[in-house]
Amino acid sequence: PVAIERLFTSGHQIRSALVLHEKAPRLQELYAAHSVNAPLFTCDRDTMIAVTGFDLHRGVIAAADRKPIPTGSQRNDVLAGLSKIAVLEGLNDPENLGAIARSARAFGVQALVLDERCIDPYTRRSVRVSMGEVLHAPTMRFTSADDLNGLLTGWTTWALTPHHSADDIWQLDLPPRLALM
């Protein structure tokens, strides 16, 4: 599965994986290629369903330790070298967040900046819908409008809308530092 393969290149530390017997050879290859030293458990489909509580049609699930989420001035350090970020507010559907993360990565967005009301970007559903792309983008949170204004100092902000009267973003010149909302 693509999301699991992307986990290996994301910088998140893999703790263990549970796979169907027939998936083990591919996971063993990934473990070796990325020097992962974590348990790899195998089982049959019935056991996996009993352990996870649902039918994983791909037959692979992994647990990983998250990279620390930047806070305070660390956020500015992460943003310093970037040119395009996405700012998300009040997004509480994991499928929507996953779809946005996947699309954002395709369009060169380098980080996700989320308010405190946004769902955890690392929920199983968000990771799966994003096809693992959410694992690659630095993610940080802001706590208030003032906090966001401080983070976006020096950034040009574009509010996106599908409304027919909006400017066509493909016709606009991109500023050197762009925050998409």
Predicted feature locations:
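N-terminal positively charged helical leader segments and presequences
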Residues: P1-D55, G59, G154
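RNA substrate-binding interface of SAM-dependent RNA methyltransferases
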Residues: E5, T9, F41-T42, P68-I169
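Short active-site oxyanion
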Residues: Q13-A17, V36-P39, Q110-L112, A137, ...
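Short, hydrophobic beta-strand segments that form beta-sheet elements in well-ordered domains
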Residues: A17-L20, T156-P162, A179-M181
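Short Pro/Gly-enriched coil loops immediately N-terminal to beta-strands
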Residues: D55-H57, G132-E133, L174
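Conserved catalytic motifs of the protein kinase core domain
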Residues: G59, S83, R177
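Glycine-rich phosphate-binding loops that contact phosphosugars or nucleotide phosphates
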Residues: A62
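A contiguous loop/helix-start segment that scaffolds small-molecule binding in enzyme catalytic cores
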Residues: Q171-L180
